[in-house]
Amino acid sequence: MKISEVDRTKLSPMMAQYMEIKDKYKEELVFYRLGDFYEMFFDDALIASRELELTLTGRVAGLEEKVPMCGVPHNNVKPYIEKLVNKGYRVAICEQLEDPRFTKGMVKRGIVDVISKGTIADNDLLNDLDSSYIASILFFSDIIVLTILDISTGYLATLSIENDEEKLINEILEYNLKEVIFIDNLNTNLIDLLKNTYGIEVTISSEFLWNKYKNLLDTIEDARVKNGIAHLFYYLDIRQLKDLSHINKINYIKKNNYLEMDIHSIRNLELIETLRLKERTYSLIWLLDKCKTAMGSRKLKTWLLSPLKDKSKINERYDKIEKLNNEFILKDELKNALYEVYDIERLAGKVINGSLNAKDLLQLKNSIKVLPTIKDISSKLGFNYCLNTHEKLYNLLDSAIVDDPPISIKEGYMIKSGYNEELDNLRDIRSGGKDFVAAFETKVKEETGIKNLKVGFNKVFGYFIEIPNGSKSLVKEEYHWERRQTLTNCERYISPALKEKESMILNAEENIIDLEYKLFCEIKNIVKQEVPLLNKTADEISDIDAIVSLSVCSEEYNLVRPTLTDEKIIKIKDGRHPVVEVVSKSEYVPNDCILEQGIDTLLITGPNMSGKSTYMRQLAIIVIMAQMGSFVPCKSATLPIIDKIFTRIGASDDLVSGESTFMVEMKEARNAIAGATEHSLILFDELGRGTATYDGMSLAQSILEYISKNIHAFTLFSTHYHELTRLDKNFKNIKNVHVSAVENGNEITFLHKIKNGSVDKSYGIHVARLAKMPDELLNRAQEILDEYETNSKKKNPCEKVQLAMDFDVQEKKEDIIKKTINSIDVLNTTPIEALNILFDLKQKIKKGEWLWI
């Protein structure tokens, strides 16, 4: 049965109320509160029963047949919401807005919250170590404005990027956005890509909210930024019923203030998760995160993904690490204090979104309790933090909240004795009930002579006098007792005196619960006023925690303070890959990386498995760690400020977009060529492997030549195309290095040491032997290799096909080739067009057509 088919005139009052609410939330699954359950009806019930594996039943609703229904318990609803939201559904929570005890007729109900992928604010449904962002995306002629919000903490940021779809997708993936809001659905290809390929929730909303948040919006000068915030706030406030009153700060993210890395580099370098298993374990953040608070972990991740370019700010972090390393006693005290701090950021968020309970207030109190200690230690260390200790708030919470409160805020037992006089009086009445029962039982026994009677209580019948069957005859009319319950072996009565006391005690219990809830709400409102200050405190605590974490790492992993220079040199002595070093079962072999005196490119050759990729990643990781403010894994390091990092490491297809290894290579190479400057770092690992040998070799050489001639970025370029090693003769900024290995018969030993010069063997068969390929296969491979090498030696050099240009060719031919290559518009040439040009050049070389070019 579908809603559209229902005759609404026949619906029961309750179902009519449901339909009225559902009409306003047609795209959401409505969780409709009925007593102790959230119920779903009609299509929502069909979807929920399928997705949550619930039993589908029916409910009488005034129609000829029952309407589909399923439900979940209200006190265990979170796992069900999480499952639905992760599957891409939005859930609207419909609560009872009146107390059924005091309501005649239908209880008023309404939607109190709408939950989607980007608006989950409940800590139980969030990863402590990750932010949860939703974003508005507005397109303008020249730029795209992203407005980003973490609803769980109130962190609001805005950034503008070039109007380029690929760059937009990169930002969406880098910030790990859960949900994005577009003003229209005209860009269907982009919307489909985000939804179907990357699993991002996409919402269309064309409205803006101006007046309600006018004070905040009036602080913004840029009209486009103002539009972005008003667009996001309309969706969150009006459509999702979120309280945004605590947001009073806008973070303006300027991309040129940070070292730029695209999502490919972040993944290739395994900064946040490993490439193969997509897990945090064995990533760089896994290694560096020694934080004691969830806030600190999130801050450290932000630093890692946004390394600084301001030398003074970087050195400020170095100074703090150095100070902590020299004050180990203070550092230990600081670590112990930080360990006592809960997630103040998200606790403040819970105050605003209404999900706060008494246990949260207790966590907040305990966090505030150690702030004076943290402030004192920070001051002794010379840290420039103006930490607010929130003394008044601490005193309030300490006097009000019991040490072990319940999770529910509607069951009482939250507020301390002595906090409220009226509450204390009610509790005296309630506790006096126990004494009354004992005294009353003794008195009745004496008055009636019924020695085996008992006075008891249960929730159904209240207080009663229980008389065994053998003593029923002793109950006299003059007692004026009223029979309440007949059991097999006894009768239960209520007397006028007991009834009066019962009313007083039970009323006290109800009044206690109501008053405690009222007091809790008053306390919550006081805390709400302090949320902006709490957020500032949380930001400073997370800074301190992240710095302490980096200090711990510097000692645990033997890291050193790098020297930052304005010169265009990289000088790393005994550099190490920190993660590989920690997880390696054998002793790690450190390596130098020297790029100075006009040398900005290392052309790396060597066997597979010898450590070329690790060496390349190692340099990038040292640069990133240095610019995030961390000490680095080496004996010494002198580094410039790098503005961008581009990487192509590892051969893989882009399965989600259906692109081949070669196409992915070409796109990433083009990004580097188009975006790199002389202050950038480029890492290309075996570029060109994804296509035919000669095509790949020609492209690899052409790309390397272009970078060396036109960009002069710091470049590490590994290859198995040994012909490329001749390039150092014509390009003085290229230096050949290789990863050494020792060959002994059929055995090979990788030394993992970078040495000057090149090698002309890849030892592929030796590596296959290490992989335990069958001997028969290996022997045949060796025969084929010997045959190729023999034939190659017999050939006249003029007959060999050499894609690496022979540097002894006549000057005219060389000039023509240069002229042809220089005429290519690299930034606007597609990979296919580039291949066609190279193919044409090759054909003309073969046919001797150069005279008429």
Regions found by a protein language model. Name each.
Residues 487-525:
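Extended, charged coiled-coil "arm/hinge" scaffolds of SMC/Rad50-like chromosome-maintenance ATPases
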Residues 42-45, 222, 292, 297-298, ...:
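ATPase nucleotide-binding head domains, primarily ABC-like/P-loop NTPase cores
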Residues 14, 30, 446-449, 453-469:
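Extended, charged helical/alpha-beta scaffold domains that provide interaction surfaces
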Residues 458, 825-853:
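Terminal-proximal interaction/regulatory segments of ATP-powered molecular machines
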